């Protein structure tokens, strides 16, 4: 999957993600400009397949919620993700009127349904207008399909963050 040079403006409603990645392999997202009413770029794990080998680079990801998010739907695993050379943070205008020029977090990693996030590298990013530049959450929120065993607490493994700058 190759997404290159797209513009997404989905701020009209509070629950609009910009780009969702669920159960995909060999993904490249580059040179994109996303502004969303919810998460700008979100990895989800509802699919039977794991998400693997993802590159996000040279993108502008702005949100009324989380600019870059893994979760909260994390029944699957996420491996080998590189995010580099991006600007992320809060949108200038929140149409809901609930927030002023700010996202909840720049990067949110929320493993709450038993999944694992591993080999995740973030480098050379700028975070603007975020209440929390990074938000990490490990939990078992008790989300179980009928007949399935209770999942364990989620796992973060080999997470690396380097060369992060703060903006306004």
Where are these regions (language model features)?
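Extracellular/periplasmic carbohydrate-active domains that bind, remodel
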Residues: 1-168
């Amino acid at each position: 999957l190759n997404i290159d040079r797209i513009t997404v403006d989905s701020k009209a409603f509070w629950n609009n993600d910009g780009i969702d990645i669920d159960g995909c392999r060999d993904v490249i997202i580059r040179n994109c400009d996303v502004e969303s009413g919810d998460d700008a770029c979100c990895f989800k794990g509802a699919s039977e397949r794991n998400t693997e080998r993802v590159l996000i680079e040279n993108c502008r990801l702005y949100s009324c919620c989380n600019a870059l998010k893994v979760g909260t739907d994390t029944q699957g695993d996420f491996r080998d993700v590189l995010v580099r050379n991006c600007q992320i943070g809060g949108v200038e205008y929140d149409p809901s009127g609930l927030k002023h020029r700010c996202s909840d977090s720049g990067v949110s990693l929320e493993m709450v349904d038993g999944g694992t996030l591993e080999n995740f590298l973030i480098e050379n990013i700028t975070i603007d207008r975020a209440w929390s530049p990074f938000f990490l959450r490990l939990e078992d929120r008790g989300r179980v399909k009928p007949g399935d065993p209770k999942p364990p607490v989620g796992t973060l493994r080999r997470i690396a963050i380097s060369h992060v700058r703060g903006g306004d």
